[in-house]
Amino acid sequence: MFLKRGAAVSKNKYDCFLHFKGYLFPFELKSTKNKSVSFSEKIIKPQQIKHLKEAAQYPNIIPGFLFQFREPENKVYFVHINDFLTYKNIAENQLSHTYKNKINKSSIPISICEEIGTEVRLMKKKVNYTYYLNKLCDDLIKKEQQSVSAV
């Protein structure tokens, strides 16, 4: 496969990352007007999954996707890479599961993001939104610490 001349090729492993209270948060950002985000390689690229999965191997790193569902009302959810991979495997292979909501074998719907993810609180301003990422990071650190202490 050859790229067209002048085609942009990302050299970054993540769309963005935050550092907060000694933790690193690598994020892949996905936005849609639909009620689900497709697993299509055009939308979620294999190297994005690979890099997030690799990051999950290290302490104090909480990697995942930020899924923005713009319509009918703007909602954003963080889904940890491990939770995403578990869901994707169950959905694509039609395995038995304990999800309360219906699964879709080719995408992750907003209802599953609500169930397995953490909502990013936001406030609508005149034109744009303000996202409360400090609150999100605090919530994710607490979840991480609880899962580590449970083991």
Regions found by a protein language model. Give the residues of each.
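Mg2+/Mn2+-dependent nuclease catalytic core
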Residues: 32-51, 58
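Helix N-cap / beta->alpha transition motif
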Residues: 45, 77-85, 109, 132
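Short, electropositive alpha-helical surface patch
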Residues: 77-104
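Short, surface-exposed, polar/charged, turn-prone segments marking secondary-structure boundaries
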Residues: 29, 53-57, 92-97
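Conserved catalytic cores of phosphodiester-cleaving nucleases, focusing on short active-site segments
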Residues: 16-18, 23-34
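Charged phosphate-binding loop/patch that engages nucleotide di/tri-phosphates or the phosphate backbone
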Residues: 106-151
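Active-site metal-binding core of divalent-cation-utilizing nuclease and nuclease-like domains
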Residues: 1-22
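Nucleic-acid nuclease catalytic cores
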Residues: 53-86
